[in-house]
């Protein structure tokens, strides 16, 4: 049994590290074999809830201590997360005169919390992983208020947004699963520790299923507007990382911490954006497309950014450990 867990753990680490490539492969398969993945769109909220539960299982009480022990960087990251990406999303939609569905999808991505993949990318970049984890936790736990509020304020020009319905959606697919995961980890910490290397696999499988489903049911529309969405998504992501890094430098934050902030700001929980689009904006089916394409793109750009930052000044002092 122990050997089996080790093998599964290695597979989990491999899949997590190369999630961008895996998403691309499954997206291509789903594009051509649409019937094989279309069914997953009926379970988008369940998949994202499972992914969030998996994230919760990895969070320990010590992680919250780290959050409160470094309030300056956490606050800077939090403010950057919920200002830069939403405002850039809104600006791009206005600048490029996006149709309603796509504008809504881009704004949904911009208003979501940081994605869990950012922690892996931060590690690869030689950034401060503890800070990255802390920012992901705080932005995720604040999402039931911040995400609906920002979507209500920014997307109202395109569609009618029900603030309360969105709050309920985020609570169901994010807050409850994450808190449940944290509670189980707190009660059964030793047992969870034994399978800790396997846990990322839960999120990987869930996100791959979500994106594959969206690609399969929107294949024809991807052909007609995929390049436009990719261009907007790429600009959105690169602006987020660039402005996040610039803000960190302006505030004289250390190299490895600035790396973590830039990655955290630029990489979003796009799976949540897809789930919210599916649950709350059924009349705007293309609103799921920016989230799906963002999921592919930000893993690619994040990995490239990590390679650049890892080879830069300051990486020798980088915090590569989750604990300090």
Name each region found by the language model.
Residues 1-324:
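Alpha-helical transmembrane segments of multi-pass small-molecule/ion transporters
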